[in-house]
C-alpha cells in the first residue's frame, strides 16, 4: 500500500536514522516489499509505489528511506 509506505518512510527518517538495520526493524515495518540498499548495490529502476527502500551505510546503519 503506497500510503503505508509513505508513512513508514517518514517514521524511518524521523526515528531510525543512525540505527542499525536489524531483523527487529524489518519485522516492525508493515511495508511490502522492503528493499535494503547497501553502498555499491546495483538497483533496478522500476517504480513500485508500495516498496520501502531503506538505504544503509557500510556499518549497516540506516541513512535514508523512501518509497519507489
Curated annotation (Swiss-Prot):
This is Elastase inhibitor AFLEI. The lineage of its organism: Eukaryota, Fungi, Dikarya, Ascomycota, Pezizomycotina. Elastase inhibitor. Inhibitor of A.flavus elastase with a Ki of 40 nM. Inhibitor of A.fumigatus elastase and human leukocyte elastase. Inhibits the fibrinogenase and collagenase activities of A.flavus elastase. Does not inhibit porcine pancreatic elastase, trypsin, chymotrypsin, thrombin or A.acutus AC1-proteinase. Its main location: secreted. Pfam families: Inhibitor_I78. It comes from Aspergillus flavus. The keyword Ligase does not apply. Stable from pH 6 to 10. Transmembrane segments: none annotated. Keywords: Disulfide bond, Protease inhibitor, Secreted, Serine protease inhibitor. On the 2D-gel the determined pI of this protein is: 7.4.
Amino acid at each position: 500500500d503506497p500510503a503505508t509506505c509513505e508513512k513508514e518512510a517518514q517514521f524511518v527518517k524521523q526515528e531510525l536514522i543512525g540505527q542499525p538495520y536489524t531483523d527487529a526493524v524489518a519485522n516492525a515495518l508493515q511495508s511490502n516489499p522492503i528493499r535494503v540498499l547497501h553502498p555499491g548495490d546495483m538497483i533496478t529502476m522500476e517504480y513500485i509505489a508500495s516498496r520501502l527502500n531503506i538505504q544503509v551505510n557500510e556499518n549497516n546503519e540506516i541513512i535514508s528511506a523512501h518509497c519507489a
